[in-house]
Swiss-Prot record:
Coiled coil: none annotated. This is Probable pectinesterase/pectinesterase inhibitor 51. Its EC number is 3.1.1.11. GO terms for molecular function: enzyme inhibitor activity; pectinesterase activity. The keyword Chaperone does not apply. Keywords: Aspartyl esterase, Cell wall, Cell wall biogenesis/degradation, Disulfide bond, Glycoprotein, Hydrolase, Secreted, Signal. Its main location: secreted.
Length: 551
C-alpha cells in the first residue's frame, strides 16, 4: 500500500466534518416500511420528531409497526428512538466485521475496520447506559452518554473515509451516516425533554447559544471559589499498589499496575502510587478498569513519557497517546504526562481521555501538536499545567479547566520565523451534544522560551484561543488572565467560513492585555452575564455529584 494512504489513515481523526452535519442525502440505514399508526399516535410522533435535525427519517423510523406503544408518554418515544439507534448500531457492527473478513492482506483497510469495531463497541456500551439512565430519571447522564455514542459513531465513519476503495466500504459508510442521523435524532429529543418536559408541542428544533438559546440550569455552583462548592481530589486515599523504577516495590511499570486493577470495581477506587522516576511506556486504562487512580510524587518528578506520533505508518492520532484512558472514574494527581515527539512530528498526544467522571488535579501535560486529547465524556482538570502549540487541547468532551496554566511552546524548527498557534480545537459535531471546553480562572501565556521569541518579534507570532475543528465547536473563557501573546482577533478560522455561523466561542470577565474584545472576530461572543452560570462545574459537567473532595 502507498505511504500516502497510510499517512492519510493516520490523520483520520482530523478529517473534514462528516455527513452528520453537512450532508442531507438519502441513505439506507434503518429503512422501514411504515404502517399508518393511529392519527393521535402519528401526531405525537410528528411533534416529537419536529425537535430533531432529521424529522422525516425520525417519523419513518418511529412509525414502524410496534415501534412506539399506543398513546405513548414522551419518554417512551425517546426510548423507542434509542432502541432504533441500538438496532442500527448492531447492524453496523456486522457490516464492519464483513469488511474485516474481506480485507485480508490489506493492512490499511483492516486497521481501519478494526478501529471501527472498537469505537462501535464503546458506542454500544454508552447507548445501553443511556437507556438505563433515562429509566432512572438521570437525564444529564443520558445526554452525556448519548453524546459520546455519537462521537464514536462519527469517528468510526471517519476511520473508513481514507480506505473507501471498495463498494462494500462505501455502502458501510452510507449506513454509518444514517446511524449518525438516527442517534442525533434520539439525542435531540432528550434535549427538548430535559428543557421542556412532557409538553411535546413545546419541543423545538436543536438550537445553541449562538441562536440565543440557553438551557435551563441550576445556580452557578462552582463557577468561582466564593460559591463554597468544595470540589477536587478526595483526601485520605490509600494506595492499593505501588510502582517504582527500581522494581523494589509491587510493580516496575505503570501498565502492569493497571493490569492488576479489578474489572468493574463498582464505586471502589483502585489507587496506584507511582514513585518518582521517568517511566518510558505507553499506558492504556481500558473500559473495564473503572475508578483507577494515579498518584505521583509531583509534576516533573513522576513522569510517564512516550514518543508515538501520527507520522508513523499505521499510527492514528488516537493511538499516539502516551496515556490513554477509557475506564470511567479515572483520577490522577501530582505527575507529568509527556509526548516527546518534536514540533515537526505531526499529531502526538500526551494524554487522551474517554473517561466519564474524570478528575485530574496538579498534573502536567507536555507536548507540541495535540498534547491533551479530551476525546469524550465529562472531565474536570484543576490546577494543571498544559503545554503545546498546535490545537494542543482538542476533542469532543465536556471538559472544565479550572485554575490551570495554559502555555504555548515554540512550534517549529526555526521558530523565529513565526507561526499561528491555536490553544483549542473543540470538536462538537451536533448542536444537541452536551460537549464543549470551559476555562475558568486560567492563565493563558507562553513558556519562557516562547515569550523570548514573541517579544523579539511579536508581529510574526500569532496566538489564538481556539479554532473550530467541527461545525458546532464550543469553547468559553471565563475569568481568565489572557496575556499579551493572544492576538486581538482572539479566534482563528479553520478553513474559510467553515463553522463560523454555528460555533459558539464565548468570553466573560477575562483580564490581561489579551482580553480586550474591541477587535475580536465578529463570530465570537460576549457571554451575557445572566447566562455565565451555564458553564459552572456543577451545571456543565455535574461535578457537584461526583467530584467532591470528601468522596
Amino acid at each position: 500500500m502507498s505511504s500516502i494512504l497510510i499517512l492519510l489513515f493516520s490523520l483520520f481523526l482530523f478529517s473534514s466534518p462528516s455527513s452528520s452535519s453537512r450532508h442531507h442525502h438519502h441513505h439506507n440505514s434503518g429503512d422501514t416500511s411504515p404502517v399508518n399508526p393511529s392519527s393521535s399516535l402519528a401526531a405525537q410522533i410528528r411533534l416529537a420528531c419536529n425537535a430533531t435535525r432529521y424529522p422525516d427519517q425520525c417519523v419513518s423510523s418511529l412509525s414502524e409497526q410496534g415501534r412506539v406503544p399506543p398513546d405513548p408518554k414522551p419518554i417512551q418515544i425517546i426510548h423507542s428512538a434509542i432502541s432504533f439507534s441500538f438496532q442500527n448500531l448492531k447492524t453496523a457492527q456486522s457490516k464492519i466485521k464483513s469488511i474485516v473478513d474481506s480485507s485480508v492482506g490489506n493492512l490499511n483497510r483492516t486497521n481501519a475496520a478494526n478501529t471501527c469495531l472498537q469505537l462501535l463497541t464503546y458506542s454500544e456500551h454508552r447507548t445501553q447506559s443511556t437507556d438505563q439512565a433515562l429509566t432512572r430519571g438521570k437525564i444529564k447522564d443520558a445526554r452525556a452518554w448519548m453524546s459520546a455514542a455519537l462521537v464514536y459513531q462519527y469517528d468510526s465513519w471517519s476511520a473508513l473515509k481514507y480506505v473507501n476503495d471498495t463498494s462494500q466500504v462505501g455502502e458501510t459508510m452510507s449506513f454509518l451516516d444514517g446511524l449518525i442521523h438516527v442517534t442525533s435524532n434520539a439525542l435531540s429529543m432528550m434535549v427538548s425533554y430535559d428543557n421542556f418536559g412532557d409538553n411535546v408541542a413545546s419541543w423545538t428544533y436543536p438550537a445553541t447559544e449562538r441562536d440565543g438559546f440557553w438551557e435551563k440550569t441550576g445556580p452557578g455552583l462552582g463557577l468561582d471559589p466564593s460559591t463554597g462548592l468544595n470540589l477536587g481530589f478526595p483526601s485520605g486515599l490509600k494506595e492499593d499498589v505501588t510502582v517504582c523504577k527500581d522494581g523494589k516495590c509491587g510493580y516496575k511499570t505503570v501498565q502492569d499496575a493497571v493490569n492488576a486493577a479489578p474489572e468493574d470495581n463498582g464505586m471502589r477506587k483502585f489507587v496506584i502510587k507511582i514513585s518518582e522516576g521517568v517511566y518510558e511506556e505507553n499506558v492504556i486504562v481500558p473500559f473495564e478498569k473503572k475508578n483507577v487512580v494515579f498518584i505521583g510524587d509531583g509534576m516533573g518528578k513522576t513522569v510517564i513519557t512516550g514518543s508515538l506520533n501520527a507520522g508513523m505508518p499505521g499510527i492514528t492520532t488516537y493511538n499516539t497517546a502516551t496515556v490513554g484512558v477509557v475506564g470511567d472514574g479515572f483520577m490522577a494527581r501530582d505527575l507529568t504526562f509527556q509526548n516527546t515527539a518534536g514540533p515537526d512530528a505531526h499529531q502526538a498526544v500526551a494524554f487522551r481521555s474517554d473517561s466519564d467522571f474524570s478528575l485530574i488535579e496538579n498534573c502536567e501535560f507536555l507536548g507540541n501538536q495535540d498534547t491533551l486529547y479530551a476525546h469524550g465524556l465529562r472531565q474536570f482538570y484543576k490546577n494543571c499545567r498544559i503545554q503545546g502549540n498546535v490545537d494542543f487541547i482538542f476533542g469532543n468532551s465536556a471538559a472544565v479547566f479550572q485554575d490551570c496554566e495554559i502555555l504555548i511552546a515554540p512550534r517549529q524548527i526555526n521558530p523565529e520565523k513565526g507561526e499561528k498557534n491555536a490553544v483549542t480545537a473543540q470538536g462538537r459535531i451536533d448542536p444537541s451534544q452536551s460537549t464543549g471546553f470551559v476555562f475558568l480562572n486560567c492563565l493563558i501565556n507562553g513558556t519562557e522560551e516562547y515569550m523570548k521569541l514573541f517579544k523579539a518579534n511579536p508581529k510574526v507570532h500569532k496566538n489564538f484561543l481556539g479554532r473550530p475543528w467541527k461545525d458546532y465547536s464550543r469553547t468559553v473563557f471565563i475569568g481568565c488572565n489572557l496575556e499579551a501573546l493572544i492576538t486581538p482577533d482572539g479566534w482563528l478560522p479553520w478553513s474559510g467560513d467553515f463553522a463560523l455561523k454555528t460555533l459558539y466561542y464565548g468570553e466573560s470577565k477575562n483580564t490581561g492585555p489579551g482580553s480586550d474584545r474591541s477587535q475580536r472576530v465578529s463570530w465570537s461572543s460576549q457571554i451575557p452575564d445572566e447566562h455565565v452560570h451555564v458553564y459552572s462545574v456543577a451545571n456543565f459537567i455535574q461535578a457537584d455529584e461526583w467530584a467532591s473532595m470528601s468522596a
